[in-house]
């Protein structure tokens, strides 16, 4: 019996972890708004004027932008809990965006703009229900152009960066060292009187930004999210304008598929020198989640001046770090990030390998100034200490780690370079995605338990239709109950999310199957007619951690007839999900 309860707690813990990663629950350093906090701390900046809504001054990296959003509470509650789930976000055919616009008013540096479009943004790591990253589109509902040089705001919550400095300093370094990147500064964001903390105000990758960076904003634009130039994956690049055509990307893929790459032909499609600079800069800054290490967070733009593609960095909220901060991966950024297909192939060519080494040395000699970077960090830390949200308790320690990276980076890279060219240990990584392997349809009647119950297989009532890997699953016995998740531990001020757990015995082999599902706390209530809520979770075949045990993720929708987190209360509803398994991510270390 003790083993059964332990298995249940592990199950609820792991699917809750999935929920934390995908449904926007807060992390320990997340800046949740305090209902008692009515106003943002003051910066003692001079009174703003409408002239500040010119891109030239608006994105001044030394300026902290003031953004005050007013939106109906019902609309805010609707958009802030919209989310992607891990499995559906990473299926091979990417799902449509779950985010929708609502009408709002915004005051930016004292300039009032009414009837703008407001929506949540983010892929996975930055999703948050309480401090969401936001898009503000001026002309979504009304034909208006209140600003010069930009037509929308991109406000990133820096959820993965407790310093709030990574995007600001990274994009500045990219631009200064020759890679076109968005301009960026910081913003104090308030929604309906509640202070959400310090965000990054990042220039949107739209025609005004492209015009500023390249001199012409009319070229083809694609966004890359967990994708690379593999022949069968090209159309996972997201078209961002009407000029975007997949044919040149298919040609790049065909060239990179060859064992010996035709560099001259590739150079007709990709600006090789520009890419080498982008590649070396990603490596220098420790961009573990960028194109060359994780095939993620980038745009490619076909510059009309030469019809060649240039790379633009994006999602730069986790640079200046020695390791990927999420166990068990802990990938260490190195002198050469070579997991991308383009970097991997180019490093095998002596000519481009030599040019990469030369460019890294040039970056270190001409642009990487420890004195300048440390002065920027020190100044920003002093300015932000009174502005970061009180829940951001790791701010000081994170700034210390940021400084440590700056102080030690040159020595680490020079030591690696002194050892000679890196020997590649394998081919490029296959981008990670999920493949559907089954489905589950459930109707259930359960009870809420404040503590994990005894004999869970005998609890509740379950009607289930389940298929896994082509097998129709039959159960000898299956039970259900609902409780708070027990793991991972959350900060005291973060409520523990609800879970719905099914434990059953499979007829075919007597194996135990555990089905764990979770929803955001705000959605754990009876649903209205024709309404469904997002459901995420896992399926465990066998006992987790034991030989032969298999874990798969599930994603879908559900309804609640009854739902209350109170001992003995009824929890009843339906669940429709698909089962997925990971494919790709053959990382070579």
What are these model-predicted stretches?
Residues 25-569, 579-589:
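Phosphate/dinucleotide-binding and metal-coordinating scaffold of catalytic cores
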Residues 2-14:
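Bacterial N-terminal signal peptides that target proteins for export
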Residues 12-23:
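Bacterial N-terminal signal peptides
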Residues 1-3, 20, 202:
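A general, composition-driven signal for non-globular sequence regions
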């Amino acid at each position: 019996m003790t083993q059964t309860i332990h298995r249940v707690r592990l199950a609820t813990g792991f699917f809750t972890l999935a929920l934390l990663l995908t449904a926007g629950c807060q992390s320990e350093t997340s800046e949740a708004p305090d209902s008692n906090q009515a106003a943002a701390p003051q910066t003692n900046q001079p009174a703003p004027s409408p002239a500040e809504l010119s891109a030239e001054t608006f994105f001044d990296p030394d300026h902290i932008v003031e953004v005050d959003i007013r939106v109906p509470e019902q609309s805010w509650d609707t958009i802030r809990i919209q989310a992607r789930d891990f499995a559906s976000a990473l299926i091979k055919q990417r799902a449509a965006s779950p985010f929708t616009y609502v009408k709002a008013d915004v005051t930016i540096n004292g300039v009032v703009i009414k009837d703008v479009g407001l929506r949540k943004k983010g892929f996975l790591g930055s999703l948050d229900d309480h401090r969401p990253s936001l898009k503000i589109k001026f002309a979504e509902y009304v034909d208006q152009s209140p600003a010069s040089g930009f037509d929308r705001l991109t406000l990133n919550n820096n959820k993965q960066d407790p310093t709030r400095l990574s995007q600001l300093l990274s994009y500045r370094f990219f631009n200064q060292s020759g890679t076109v990147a968005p301009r960026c500064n910081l913003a104090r964001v308030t929604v309906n009187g509640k202070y959400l903390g310090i965000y990054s105000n990042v220039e949107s990758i739209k025609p005004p930004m492209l015009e500023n960076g390249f001199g012409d904003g009319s070229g083809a634009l694609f966004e890359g999210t967990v994708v690379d130039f593999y022949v069968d994956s090209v159309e996972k690049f997201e078209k961002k304008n009407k000029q975007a055509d997949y044919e040149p990307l298919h040609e790049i893929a065909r060239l990179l598929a060859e064992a010996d790459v035709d560099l001259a032909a590739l150079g007709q499609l990709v600006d090789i020198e520009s890419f080498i600079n982008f590649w070396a800069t990603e490596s220098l800054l420790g961009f573990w989640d960028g194109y060359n290490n994780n095939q993620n967070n980038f745009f490619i733009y076909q510059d009309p001046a030469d019809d060649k593609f240039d790379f633009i960095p994006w999602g730069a909220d986790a640079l200046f770090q020695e390791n990927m901060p999420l166990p068990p991966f802990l990938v260490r950024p190195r002198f050469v990030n070579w997991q991308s297909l383009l970097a991997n192939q180019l490093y095998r060519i002596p000519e481009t390998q030599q040019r990469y080494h030369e460019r890294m040395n040039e970056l270190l000699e001409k642009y990487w100034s420890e004195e300048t970077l440390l002065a920027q960090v020190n100044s920003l830390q002093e300015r932000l200490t009174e502005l970061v949200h009180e829940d951001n308790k790791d701010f000081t320690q994170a700034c210390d780690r940021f400084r440590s990276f700056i102080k030690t980076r040159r020595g680490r890279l020079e030591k690696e370079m002194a050892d000679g060219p890196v020997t590649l240990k394998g081919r490029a990584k296959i981008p990670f995605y999920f493949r559907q392997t089954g489905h589950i349809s459930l109707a259930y009647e359960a009870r809420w338990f404040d503590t994990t119950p005894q004999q869970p297989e005998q609890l509740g009532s379950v009607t289930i239709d389940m298929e896994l890997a082509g097998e129709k699953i039959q159960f000898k016995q299956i039970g259900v109950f609902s409780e708070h998740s027990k793991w991972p531990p959350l900060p005291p001020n973060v409520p523990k999310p609800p879970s719905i757990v099914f434990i059953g015995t499979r007829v075919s082999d007597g194996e135990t199957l555990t089905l764990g599902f979770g929803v955001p706390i705000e959605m754990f209530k009876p649903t209205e007619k024709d309404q469904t809520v997002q459901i995420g979770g896992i399926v465990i075949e066998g006992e987790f951690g034991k030989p032969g045990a298999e874990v798969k993720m599930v994603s879908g929708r559900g309804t609640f007839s009854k739902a209350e987190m109170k001992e003995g209360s009824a929890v009843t509803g339906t669940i429709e999900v698909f089962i997925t398994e990971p494919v790709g991510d053959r990382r070579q270390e």
